Amino acid sequence: MKRISNSIVGMLVVVLSVMLLLPVEGHEGHGVVELIMGKLGAPECGREASGKVCPDDLCCSVFGHCGVSVQHCGDGCQSQCVTNWRCGKDFDDRTCPKKLLCCSKDGWCGNTDAHCGEGCQSQCEQYNWRCGVDFGNRTCPNDLCCSVGGWCGTTDDHCGEGCQSQCEQYNWHCGVDFGNRTCPNDLCCSEWGWCGITEGYCGEGCQSQCNHQRCGKDFAGRTCLNDLCCSEWGWCGSSEAHCGQGCQSNCDYNRCGRNFGFRTCPNELCCSSGGWCGSNDAHCGKGCQSQCDYWRCGVDFSGRVCPQGRCCSAWGWCGDTEEYCEEGCQSQCKLSSLPSPLSQILAIRKLNATIPTMAVE
């Protein structure tokens, strides 16, 4: 009888062992043991795996293995350490684990209008930069092109081969050689048929909308479009040269903090000690007034991964240059082939902020 009992126990052990090694539905390649106790063998994520992050938003443990247990998502977790889909004020102001999901007014993560529209708590603007078949056939704002990968932008990657929508509209050519087309966003059309805002576009030979980027006392007191600042020299933009000393109108643009009604910055940018919006150490470091951790990541920040697919540097800052993405990079270390939503926002802002050298001096 004892011999039979031992045989039964042995068979149960074998069956249980096989079951525990079977893949878990929805997490192919990960068995029950792996997900709960951790996988043995070579690291599959984190520092020792070139900053790779786990699939399906699994946590990356201190030892570089993917799973959902406390051992993975607790102390030492390297990335994606929050695995549930709740967010917002009732959940420690947590943002959503997927980089492009909005947090709804009820604290759920998603990418529908119910999540990203009225009452949205965080990451509400990011979804605006996704488009196409995987995003409800949404078109891009401001007539931007929708790339084959579903990103909004103006480069050849967006408007060229594979472009899904508005592929012709955001053309940077204009004037008599292009059907007398005018430029988008009230940009000037240069003598040679290109759109821009500097004196080379808006000055001698300009074909259309030649004064739209000018403002102030020398231009009939005109204010800038999109609430941009009007510089001392009568140019529209958002830099300190526009909004600082000598600014003529809309001078609070891109300002934030205690001296500006405790205003927070758009797109989750940090508010510096001096009240300027930005994302570098000068804005998010010492003296930062609000949204100071949005661009922090890695082991010292609960294994947070960077928004918009940016790299997490060895020091826990988000960025997209070699300094962030190479030696010591903690997560998302391979740069995307397409610009991130933020880079698109900043590119457009940079375009609007361009000032002719002679005007600045």
From Swiss-Prot:
SMART domains cross-referenced by the UniProt entry: ChtBD1
UniProt domain Chitin-binding type-1: residue ranges: 42-83, 84-127, 128-170, 171-211, 212-252, 253-293, 294-335
Cystine bridges: 45-60, 54-66, 59-73, 77-81, 87-103, 96-109, 102-116, 120-124, 131-146, 140-152, 145-159, 163-167, 174-189, 183-195, 188-202, 206-210, 215-230, 224-236, 229-243, 247-251, 256-271, 265-277, 270-284, 288-292, 297-312, 306-318, 311-325, 329-333
Pfam families cross-referenced by the UniProt entry: Chitin_bind_1
Alphabetic keyword roster: Chitin-binding, Disulfide bond, Glycoprotein, Lectin, Mitogen, Repeat, Signal
InterPro entries to which the protein is assigned, alphabetical: Chitin-bd_1 (IPR001002), Chitin-binding_1_CS (IPR018371), Endochitinase-like_sf (IPR036861)
Record's function text: N-acetyl-D-glucosamine binding lectin. Has high hemagglutinating activity towards human erythrocytes. Shows potent mitogenic activity towards human peripheral blood lymphocytes.
Protein name: Lectin-B
Organism of origin: Phytolacca americana
